[in-house]
């Protein structure tokens, strides 16, 4: 059976991505990162989601990039802001996060002799992060072609971003069609230890907008009524 490494955060997009990988018949190896994020409850969700999808193996890699600061998601001196609309690159951007994550996933994929890596990046209904764009995925694919044994032997590991051109509503509809239980997911940047959402950060607003446009009941549980 062909193998794939899937990056899962515990959120809506990455869970949909895992469902897509399962639907394609991949033997799924799920990978999460504890990088010092404040919303640690997403990792609790990720572990439950990996078990729910019966992945072959689930690993959590601990990184210390949070110590470097530079993002409201990791730096205690910076507050996670409410939804900022069309701000180009918000303070919740974690510098080079997807590059670091994909590099580690690439190494594991080589070890596993996996065919693909799947990431839930999207360039529509997103927070403006530069490492969630199609050109970024294409650039990392070039790196994978050049920097791996498989790549130079003509069997490059494919970097797949199946949600890259989907709106949040389209992503939710896709996941719903694949049987995803979104009540298991945690997307909020300010989620508490129980995984309850704030309802006001970028991620919460985009999630609410997605369910509304998809005309699917939002199962998100909030700290206070929003």
Curated annotation (Swiss-Prot):
Zn(2+) binds at residues 188, 198, 201, 204. Its EC number is 6.3.4.20. ATP binds at residues 8-18. Gene3D superfamilies: HUPs. It comes from the Bacteria. Pathway: Purine metabolism; 7-cyano-7-deazaguanine biosynthesis. InterPro entries: QueC (IPR018317), Rossmann-like_a/b/a_fold (IPR014729). It catalyses: 7-carboxy-7-deazaguanine + NH4(+) + ATP = 7-cyano-7-deazaguanine + ADP + phosphate + H2O + H(+). Binds 1 zinc ion per subunit. It is an enzyme of class 6 (ligase). GO terms for biological process: queuosine biosynthetic process. GO terms for molecular function: ATP binding; ligase activity, forming carbon-nitrogen bonds; zinc ion binding. Its cofactor is Zn(2+). Disulfide bonds: none annotated. Pfam families: QueC. Keywords: ATP-binding, Ligase, Metal-binding, Nucleotide-binding, Queuosine biosynthesis, Zinc. Transmembrane segments: none annotated. Belongs to the QueC family. Catalyzes the ATP-dependent conversion of 7-carboxy-7-deazaguanine (CDG) to 7-cyano-7-deazaguanine (preQ(0)). HAMAP family: QueC. NCBIfam families: 7-cyano-7-deazaguanine synthase QueC. This is 7-cyano-7-deazaguanine synthase. It comes from Coxiella burnetii (strain Dugway 5J108-111). The gene is queC.
């Amino acid at each position: 059976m062909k193998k794939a490494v899937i990056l899962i955060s515990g959120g809506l997009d990455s869970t949909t991505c895992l469902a897509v990988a399962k639907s394609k018949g991949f033997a799924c190896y799920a990978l999460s990162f504890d990088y010092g994020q404040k919303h640690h409850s997403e990792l609790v969700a990720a572990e439950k989601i990996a078990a729910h999808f019966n992945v072959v193996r689930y690993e959590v890699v601990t990184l210390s990039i949070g110590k470097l600061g530079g993002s409201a998601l990791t730096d205690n001196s910076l507050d996670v802001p409410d939804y900022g609309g069309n701000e180009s690159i918000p303070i919740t951007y974690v510098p080079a996060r997807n590059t670091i994550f994909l590099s580690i996933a690439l190494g594991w994929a080589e070890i596993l002799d996996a065919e693909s890596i799947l990431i839930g990046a999207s360039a529509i209904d997103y927070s403006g992060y530069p490492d969630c764009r199609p050109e970024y995925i294409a650039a990392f694919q070039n790196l994978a072609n050049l920097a791996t044994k498989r790549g130079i032997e003509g069997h490059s590991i494919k970097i797949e971003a199946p949600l890259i051109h989907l709106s949040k509503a389209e992503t939710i509809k896709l996941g719903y069609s694949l049987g995803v239980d979104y009540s298991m997911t945690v997307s909020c940047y300010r989620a508490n230890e129980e995984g309850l959402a704030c309802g006001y950060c970028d991620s919460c607003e985009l999630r609410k907008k997605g369910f509304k446009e998809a005309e699917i009941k939002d199962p998100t549980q909030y700290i206070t009524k929003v």
